[in-house]
């Protein structure tokens, strides 16, 4: 490389006699004289042995490094963190899950800005890795690529992690013996990779590919595969082109690119968490994405992927028929994607998809547009007097489109879960789990344990659940989350009392607490904000700085 442009940042760290101490330290980690003349590419690895989602990412980081080095740049691998949702679910530890998104983002910014990396490649596996990495890349706004760690293979008898959660409910209901629960526990997770359905990790990886920030089909590869290794090498080579042409996240992560991502995740039947995270990712790059965008795009976008949790197939089975590239080609040909959006290949979306073959005849995973699972979005944005600033539900229609029931109110996830397991929740109830929002939790925990218990008890079509917390991508049933304003801020969800009638109407997109305005005002006047649950440490700091879920639950908004 002769141009100084690809060394915009690293030259300040390593050039000139005054930087001899910097070069001396870098020589100790393997730099030679020629390396100081190359672009430096930080490789942000989320490797960790705390979860199978990330246990293999160290080897993927090495493959990325090979690609970077072979293309004439210098790779520098460093680590950031991960928190496993699946392991911490239903415990106090889950309060750190969404917080970890900010820690990942902040740490990528800190390391690559502090060390003068000219470009960055981030590799993620577990749910919060994806938005955390993208937010960090967007903040830095240096040539960047995201690499997905890949999906896990199915467990025995087509099981996955959600099978284990739902088996807990089935055991509590007396439908299966303890030996069957133990067998499912021991055979559902066969090795490395992210949770296998169209849960949060696979949803967000797909969204990032549609954004143009990962290589074609990066989101649809098994974690342990030659294709995933090649994806890493290809990303390492591609970053050099981005450096030479100064193509940055702000050139790729445009409003139209986010519209592409929203369109794709709706067709896939993706996780409600995508709403929160896409808003946050857009905010990091200075693009405004709101709940209204999900409504606008959702009105004209069908759900056509028969994938878990609402469907029957796993991501590994979608991979076998071609991944998401053929779906994106179908969407492009139907005029539903913006083909002129730039991507990390240096080509437009349309150019990347030009030669993609369609799915094989006879496959039943991706349905035709004229025979959708649902004719419009399953991600239903609700308003009404219970959620005047918005709430997010995932309703495919299998649960019905309207639910009216009487409230059973719980001020924590633990209380709600115990009540469900103990049989206190019955058909016709609306379970209200509150004070679990970004500030009130703090940390906006996912309610996979309660929703799985409801399904395992056989109440999936007879009980609704609403919360100011979140839902796992594996949650299913008549569920509404992200209720704003949250209870801790005095939102209407804080005013619900046991026995109140609540109506959730997906067609009118309203969630209504069926009491008079006068009664609502009276309850509001009596309400008092509870004391914060934490006064020091990470969760306390997070609660003081985090924004509303309707604006992405970000922590760096100007005060």
UniProtKB/Swiss-Prot annotation:
The active site is at 472 (proton acceptor). Its cofactor is [2Fe-2S] cluster; Mg(2+). It catalyses: (2R)-2,3-dihydroxy-3-methylbutanoate = 3-methyl-2-oxobutanoate + H2O; (2R,3R)-2,3-dihydroxy-3-methylpentanoate = (S)-3-methyl-2-oxopentanoate + H2O. This is Dihydroxy-acid dehydratase 2. GO terms for biological process: isoleucine biosynthetic process; L-valine biosynthetic process. It is an enzyme of class 4 (lyase). Pathway: Amino-acid biosynthesis; L-isoleucine biosynthesis; L-isoleucine from 2-oxobutanoate: step 3/4; Amino-acid biosynthesis; L-valine biosynthesis; L-valine from pyruvate: step 3/4. Binds 1 [2Fe-2S] cluster per subunit. This cluster acts as a Lewis acid cofactor. Homodimer. Keywords: 2Fe-2S, Amino-acid biosynthesis, Branched-chain amino acid biosynthesis, Iron, Iron-sulfur, Lyase, Magnesium, Metal-binding. The modification N6-carboxylysine is found at residue 128. Coiled coil: none annotated. Mg(2+) binds at residues 85, 127-128, 446. Functions in the biosynthesis of branched-chain amino acids. Catalyzes the dehydration of (2R,3R)-2,3-dihydroxy-3-methylpentanoate (2,3-dihydroxy-3-methylvalerate) into 2-oxo-3-methylpentanoate (2-oxo-3-methylvalerate) and of (2R)-2,3-dihydroxy-3-methylbutanoate (2,3-dihydroxyisovalerate) into 2-oxo-3-methylbutanoate (2-oxoisovalerate), the penultimate precursor to L-isoleucine and L-valine, respectively. [2Fe-2S] cluster binds at residues 53, 126, 195. It comes from Pseudoalteromonas translucida (strain TAC 125). Its EC number is 4.2.1.9. GO terms for molecular function: 2 iron, 2 sulfur cluster binding; dihydroxy-acid dehydratase activity; magnesium ion binding. Belongs to the IlvD/Edd family.
């Amino acid at each position: 490389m002769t141009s100084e442009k690809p060394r915009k940042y690293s030259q300040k760290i390593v050039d000139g006699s005054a930087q001899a101490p910097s070069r001396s330290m870098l020589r100790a980690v393997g730099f030679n004289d020629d390396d100081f003349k190359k672009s430096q590419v930080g490789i942000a690895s989320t490797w960790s042995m705390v979860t199978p989602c990330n246990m293999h990412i160290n080897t993927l980081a090495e493959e990325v490094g090979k690609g970077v080095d072979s293309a004439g740049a210098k790779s520098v691998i460093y680590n950031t963190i991960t928190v496993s949702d699946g392991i911490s679910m239903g415990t106090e530890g889950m309060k750190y899950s969404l917080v970890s998104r900010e820690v990942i983002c902040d740490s990528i910014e800190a390391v690559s800005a502090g060390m003068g990396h000219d470009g960055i490649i981030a590799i993620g596996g577990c749910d919060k890795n994806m938005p955390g990495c993208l937010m960090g890349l967007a903040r830095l706004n240096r040539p960047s690529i995201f690499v997905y760690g890949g999906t896990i293979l199915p467990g025995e008898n087509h099981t996955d992690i959600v099978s284990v959660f739902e088996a807990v409910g089935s055991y509590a209901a007396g439908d299966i013996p303890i030996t069957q629960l133990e067998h499912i526990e021991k055979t559902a997770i066969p090795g490395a990779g992210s949770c296998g359905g169209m849960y949060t990790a696979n949803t967000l990886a797909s969204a990032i590919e549609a954004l143009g920030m990962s290589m074609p089909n990066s989101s649809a590869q098994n974690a342990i595969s030659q294709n995933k290794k090649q994806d890493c090498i290809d990303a390492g080579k591609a970053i050099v082109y981005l450096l030479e042409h100064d193509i940055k996240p702000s050139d790729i992560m445009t409003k139209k690119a986010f519209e592409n991502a929203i369109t794709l995740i709706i067709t896939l039947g993706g996780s409600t968490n995508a709403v929160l995270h896409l808003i946050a990712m857009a905010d990091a790059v200075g693009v405004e994405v709101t709940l209204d965008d999900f409504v606008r795009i959702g009105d004209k976008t069908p759900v056509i992927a028969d994938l878990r949790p609402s469907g029957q197939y796993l991501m590994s089975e979608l991979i076998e028929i071609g991944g998401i590239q053929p779906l994106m080609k179908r969407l492009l040909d139907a005029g539903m994607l913006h083909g002129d959006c730039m991507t990390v290949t240096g080509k437009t979306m349309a150019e990347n998809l030009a030669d993609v073959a369609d799915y094989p005849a006879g496959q039943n995973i991706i349905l035709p547009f004229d025979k959708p699972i649902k004719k419009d979005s399953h991600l239903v944005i609700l308003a009404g007097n219970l959620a005047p600033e918005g709430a997010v539900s995932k309703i495919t229609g299998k649960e019905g489109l309207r639910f009216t029931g009487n409230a059973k109110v719980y001020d924590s996830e633990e209380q709600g879960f115990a009540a469900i397991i103990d049989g206190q929740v019955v058909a016709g109830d609306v379970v209200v789990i509150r004070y679990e929002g970004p500030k009130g939790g703090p940390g906006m925990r996912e309610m996979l344990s309660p929703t799985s218990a409801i399904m395992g008890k056989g109440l999936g079509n007879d009980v609704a659940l609403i919360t100011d917390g979140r839902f796992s991508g594996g949650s299913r049933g008549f569920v509404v989350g992200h209720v704003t304003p949250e209870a801790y801020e005095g939102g209407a969800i804080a005013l619900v009392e046991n026995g109140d009638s609540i109506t959730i109407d997906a067609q009118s997109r309203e969630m209504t607490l069926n009491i008079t305005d006068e009664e609502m005002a009276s309850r509001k006047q009596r309400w008092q904000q509870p004391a914060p649950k934490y006064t020091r440490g990470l969760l306390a700091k997070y609660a003081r700085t985090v924004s509303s879920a309707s604006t992405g639950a970000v922590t760096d908004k100007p005060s």
